[in-house]
């Protein structure tokens, strides 16, 4: 069965994210001297939707601000790519702590909460959304509380607790790694620090050997893995990009987050060899666009990308939408998990899908 999606049915304003999508592009500081306001953006889109779409396409394919050498986010991302998103010492440390806490048994949430209380004298408190408006978590050292919004689901709550434990117990190791990266700005260092702290939290929730063994035993069945480790699809996808331990390597996935306009919000290459910003693939028939028409469904697709490469590679992609707990701005995103097509026969979700033709939606 193939999903029913006609890209020609999209209006141009929908394909570029409407006024919001166009306004975001116009807000680039390269255009700051022009003083373009929202009303002008609306007029441009209404009067010349095809021209607006052409501008958006050129903007997205140009060297974005995130790729500038002096851009903190781009600098931090390139540092992560040098490690192939695998931080061996911290991964081992998180695995040892997971074993110590016996996170494979019983209620994981209880074990994490007890660690906070016994080692750090911190309690975890769930607060009404109106008490922490716009926030999903807050550390109140005066009250000795990690305060979490009621808007967070179970997986998100466990992640926030694990992240706080990572920050408290591995701060020195994380700081040493960040300082050793030789980044040029405090902002870039903070971005890398946040990423590595998230990494440790995920490694605590999905300890390396146990997680890799489950991946191999289930043929990387994403549905089973989400249930077995009680994590979200987003958390699972990020962890799958990290499996590069020497002698115990997993499959080389990349992970990308997109908004409805197809604008890339986040990209993690892992060891996949995929190159940001996935040149040659931004077009409506690619699977991230279709996920918004089939909310929550896991869609699959074989594609080719690698514009400018001598031999563009074939990839297998899995994608679905996610809802971000308690965060309005990114309330709906598409996550794409991908790896080279030559590895796809090792995935449960690829079974029964023909390798060709490419650039068409799969079952």
What are these regions (language model features)?
Residues 2-363:
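Short juxta-domain linker segments that transition from a proline/glycine-rich
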């Amino acid at each position: 069965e193939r999903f029913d999606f006609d890209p020609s049915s999209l209006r141009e304003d929908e394909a570029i994210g409407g006024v919001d999508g166009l306004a975001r592009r116009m807000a680039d500081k390269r255009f700051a001297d022009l003083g373009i306001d929202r009303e002008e953006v609306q007029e441009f889109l209404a009067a010349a939707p095809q021209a607006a779409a052409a501008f958006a396409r050129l903007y997205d394919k140009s060297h974005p601000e995130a790729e500038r050498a002096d851009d903190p986010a781009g600098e931090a991302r390139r540092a992560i790519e040098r490690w192939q998103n695998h931080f061996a010492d911290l991964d081992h440390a998180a695995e040892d702590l997971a074993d110590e806490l016996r996170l494979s048994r019983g209620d994981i949430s209880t074990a994490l909460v007890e660690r906070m209380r016994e080692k750090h004298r911190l309690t975890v408190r769930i607060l009404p959304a109106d008490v922490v408006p716009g926030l999903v978590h807050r550390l109140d050292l005066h009250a000795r509380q990690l305060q979490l919004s009621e808007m967070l689901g179970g997986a998100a709550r466990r992640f926030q607790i694990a992240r706080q434990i990572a920050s408290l117990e591995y701060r020195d190791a994380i700081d040493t790694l960040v300082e050793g990266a030789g980044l040029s700005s405090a902002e870039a260092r903070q971005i890398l620090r946040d990423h590595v702290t998230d990494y440790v939290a995920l490694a605590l929730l999905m300890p390396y050997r146990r997680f890799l063994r489950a991946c191999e035993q289930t043929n990387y069945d994403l549905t089973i893995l989400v249930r077995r480790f009680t994590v979200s699809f987003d958390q699972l996808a990020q962890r799958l990009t990290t499996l590069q331990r020497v002698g115990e390597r997993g499959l080389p996935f990349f992970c990308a987050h997109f908004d409805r306009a197809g604008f890339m919000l986040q990209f993690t290459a892992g060891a996949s060899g995929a190159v940001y910003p996935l040149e040659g693939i931004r077009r409506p028939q690619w699977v991230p666009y279709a996920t918004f028409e089939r909310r929550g469904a896991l869609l699959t697709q074989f594609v080719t990308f690698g514009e400018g490469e001598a031999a563009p590679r074939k990839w297998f992609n899995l994608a679905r939408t996610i809802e971000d707990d308690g965060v309005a701005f990114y309330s709906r995103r598409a996550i794409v998990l991908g790896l080279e097509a030559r590895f796809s026969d090792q995935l449960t979700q690829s079974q029964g899908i023909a390798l060709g033709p490419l650039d068409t939606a799969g079952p």
